[in-house]
């Protein structure tokens, strides 16, 4: 986190000076505000998956997983729409409308916004694998999203797109992490009862309702 924050600040200082550093700070604060929904949701459903896996209720897990994916996909589109439609309001929470910092942050936030389409899947996937006692996969997704792919974007995109590349580094990291998350979910779905065919055996009985 400290490394990527330093890079964000150093790159923005080089391109836009102190106003740029303030603007990227505002955008990152706004990001945290909007993705808090995914964090709260993922932490809330994680114990449900843990309990049902321990009980061997893989039919429930599969059904809940479907509900969660639908919620994440719909809310991702909704949050993106809100971020674009109310970008001025969101940025205005942290800066004075009409100021140079506000103008830079507003332009950057609109370029940054596509990250919200993918962040929900990544946060949910990481929490899900933790709940299912697969800490290694959870850590890989989290590391890729918050450091690995983000560092790659910060090192490459500004060279190609200048300051626009800074705003697009997070959307790129979220997109690549989303592809990684989907790959892990597909690869491990049979292990956790999310795929078709026979369900894993884990000491409980299937059936029942939530």
What does each model-identified segment do?
Residues 1-2, 39, 119-120, 146-150:
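Transmembrane alpha-helical core positions of polytopic small-molecule transporters
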Residues 21, 31-34, 102-110, 145:
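Alpha-helical membrane-interface segments at transmembrane helix boundaries
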Residues 29-30, 143-152:
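Small-residue-enriched core segments of transmembrane alpha-helices in multipass membrane transport
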Residues 19-20, 135-137, 162-163:
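Membrane-helix interface segments
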Residues 9, 23-81, 85-87, 119-141:
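Small-residue-rich hydrophobic transmembrane alpha-helices
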Residues 49-115, 156-210:
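Short alpha-helical transmembrane segments in multi-pass integral membrane proteins
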Residues 6-11, 33, 124-128, 151-156, ...:
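Alpha-helical transmembrane segments of multipass membrane proteins
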Residues 2-33, 51, 89-98, 159-160:
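Helix-terminus/linker motif at the lipid-water interface of multi-pass membrane proteins
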């Amino acid at each position: 986190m400290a490394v990527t924050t330093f890079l964000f600040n150093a790159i923005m200082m080089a391109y836009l000076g102190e106003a740029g550093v303030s603007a990227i700070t505002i955008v990152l604060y706004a990001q945290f505000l909007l993705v808090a929904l995914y964090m709260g949701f993922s932490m809330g459903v994680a114990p449900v998956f843990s309990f049902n896996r321990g009980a061997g209720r893989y039919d429930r897990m599969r059904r809940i997983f479907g509900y969660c994916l639908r919620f994440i996909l719909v809310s991702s589109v909704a949050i993106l729409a809100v971020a674009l439609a109310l970008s001025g309001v969101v940025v205005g929470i942290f800066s004075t409308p009409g100021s140079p910092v506000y103008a830079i942050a507003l332009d950057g936030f609109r370029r940054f916004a596509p990250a919200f389409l993918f962040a929900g899947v990544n946060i949910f996937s990481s929490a899900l694998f933790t709940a299912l006692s697969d800490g290694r996969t959870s850590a890989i997704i989290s590391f890729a999203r918050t450091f690995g792919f983000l560092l790659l974007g910060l090192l490459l995109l500004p060279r190609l797109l200048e300051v626009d590349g800074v705003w697009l580094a997070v959307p790129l990291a979220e997109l690549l992490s989303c592809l990684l998350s989907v790959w892990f979910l597909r690869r491990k779905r049979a292990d956790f009862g999310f795929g078709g065919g026979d369900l894993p055996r884990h000491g409980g009985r299937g059936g029942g309702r939530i």
